[in-house]
Structure formats: structure tokens, C-alpha cells
């Protein structure tokens, strides 16, 4: 199945949240599928909130890394999702999808990332391939509107990325700090 599924009784609310499924991880979770408020106490199922679910599980070349073909297809399928919305992006294996939203921001901005990894390493696959571990580096190198990245939570040993970049636009707050 591919496409968009709206969860809600009538029309889409002014402030829906968006779930992007790449692995099918949400299929076994019920918090976003409840039909009635009584079915869950989850905050995402309160009146006035709608879930827009975008199924991208049929896109190959997207697990851990993003091939050029997968990136093109994801950009098409995610074009309906506003940048300034709440996005649930599958698992950490697909962190790079954040870059697809960041590249649509057309004014100066800062990135605040809470993660155990910096996600700003050069691709282990070479050739500048976009991966779940390299998307912040891609953003810093290619998005002129990204003025600062604040990374909160990387392991102390992940400071190798900071040495690699020597970029004054990055602020680190490691897990030990």
C-alpha cells in the first residue's frame, strides 16, 4: 500500500501531525489508529488532532541510506507535508528524511538535534551518499540557510565529527555534559 491515509472523523484539522512510514514500524502500534478517544489516552488522539499517514514502505534504497532514486521519490511523496508541522519519521534508520524537510526552509534557521549520535559523519559508503549518520553534514555543506546546528546528547567519542568539520556553526553538548 502506498499513499496517504487520514485518521479523523471529518475534515483534517488545522494542525494535523504527520506519520511517515518507511519500514512499516507503525503498523503494529495502535496509538495513532484509535477510532475513538476512549481507545487510548495518548495525546495524539485528542479532539482536533488528525494524523496524516504517508506510506513509503515500497520505496527501495531507503534503509540506512538514501539512493538518488529513493530521494527523488521521497521528495515527491512528502511534498504535501508542511515543514512547520509535527513529523514522526519512522525509526532512526531514516533520520536523513529530516534533511528533505530542512532543504525546503527558505529563510535562515538553526537546527536543534537531540540524539546519541551526531549524524554528521562522512558516509561510510563513500561518494557523498546520504545516510542516517551523515544527514547533518549534508545539511551543513549544502543548505545556506542553516546557520547553526546544536547537537545535544552525542557520545563523547563522537567528537571526532567535530574535528572532521572544524565548523564554528556546530555547538556540542555531549551526553557527559
Where are these regions (language model features)?
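Conserved alpha-helical scaffold segments that buttress catalytic/binding sites
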Residues: 3-177
Amino acid at each position: 500500500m502506498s499513499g496517504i491515509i487520514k485518521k479523523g472523523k471529518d475534515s483534517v484539522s488545522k494542525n494535523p501531525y504527520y506519520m511517515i512510514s518507511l519500514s512499516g514500524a507503525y503498523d503494529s502500534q495502535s496509538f495513532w489508529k484509535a477510532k475513538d478517544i476512549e481507545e487510548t489516552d495518548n495525546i495524539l488522539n485528542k479532539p482536533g488532532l488528525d494524523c496524516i499517514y504517508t506510506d513509503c514502505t515500497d520505496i527501495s534504497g531507503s534503509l540506512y541510506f538514501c539512493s538518488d532514486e529513493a530521494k527523488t521519490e521521497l521528495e515527491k511523496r512528502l511534498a504535501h507535508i508542511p515543514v512547520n508541522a509535527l513529523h514522526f519519521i519512522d525509526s532512526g534508520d531514516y533520520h536523513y528524511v529530516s534533511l528533505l524537510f530542512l532543504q525546503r526552509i527558505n529563510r535562515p534557521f538553526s537546527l536543534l538535534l537531540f540524539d546519541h549520535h551526531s549524524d554528521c559523519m562522512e558516509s561510510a559508503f563513500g561518494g557523498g551518499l546520504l545516510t542516517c549518520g551523515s544527514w547533518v553534514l549534508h545539511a551543513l555543506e549544502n543548505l545556506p540557510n542553516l546557520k547553526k546546528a546544536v547537537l545535544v546528547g552525542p557520545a563523547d567519542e563522537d567528537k571526532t565529527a567535530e574535528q572532521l568539520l572544524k565548523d564554528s556553526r556546530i555547538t556540542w553538548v555531549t551526553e557527559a555534559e
